[in-house]
Design a protein with these regions (language model features):
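Short helix-coil transition sites and intra-membrane helix breaks within transmembrane domains
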Residues: 35-44, 115-123
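Hydrophobic transmembrane alpha-helices of multi-pass, membrane-embedded glycosylation machinery
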Residues: 47-51
């Protein structure tokens, strides 16, 4: 099983590298957009690390990754807003949803910014969760973009620091 997982990761890294080499800034945007909608498809941190290791302009990486992640997050937010509540109620129940809404109403802005900004954690669930609440879509986009920019800056910086030590990863 371990060998299968390692081969799978290597395959994703290879395709990700080729995609970013061929499409640069646009490749980063598209990969981040896709991973925000389907989080298991492409790890967002790997996209940024690959772009930095491939010498894509760091400012463009930050812009493309933040815009791609936020745009994809908006799709997830909208899908959940339009039809996710009945599905969520089946899995976690009305009482838990109400508790979550109250908690999110109190701390939601912080949750969105810090949840989207934290590197090496899945920030995409935040968009889907926010869609279950009453948060204004414009507020969500602004907060999600702020968090995505912070995350991108942190990952570009860390990737640049470790680039010399990890030439064989991607």
């Amino acid at each position: 099983m371990y060998i299968f997982i390692m081969e799978f990761i290597q395959t994703i890294n290879t395709y990700l590298q080729l995609f970013i080499e061929n499409y640069g800034f646009y490749g980063v945007f598209i990969a981040m957009f896709i991973q925000a909608i389907i989080p298991v498809a492409i790890p967002s941190d790997a996209v940024i690390i690959a772009a930095v290791l491939l010498n894509v302009n760091p400012i463009l990486v930050i812009i493309a990754s933040a815009l791609g992640s936020t745009s994809g997050g908006l799709i997830g937010f909208t899908l959940t807003r339009k039809g996710g509540k009945p599905i969520a109620m089946k899995f976690i129940g009305k009482k838990q949803i109400e508790r979550f809404e109250n908690w999110f109403e109190r701390w939601g802005n912080y949750i969105i910014v810090f949840g989207r900004a934290a590197p090496f954690l899945s920030s995409d669930a935040i968009a889907f969760a926010a869609g279950l609440t009453k948060i204004n879509i414009k507020t969500f986009v602004i907060l999600a973009l702020i968090g995505a920019v912070i995350r991108s800056i942190i990952l570009v910086y860390l990737s640049d620091l470790i680039a010399d030590y990890l030439p064989d990863i991607i």
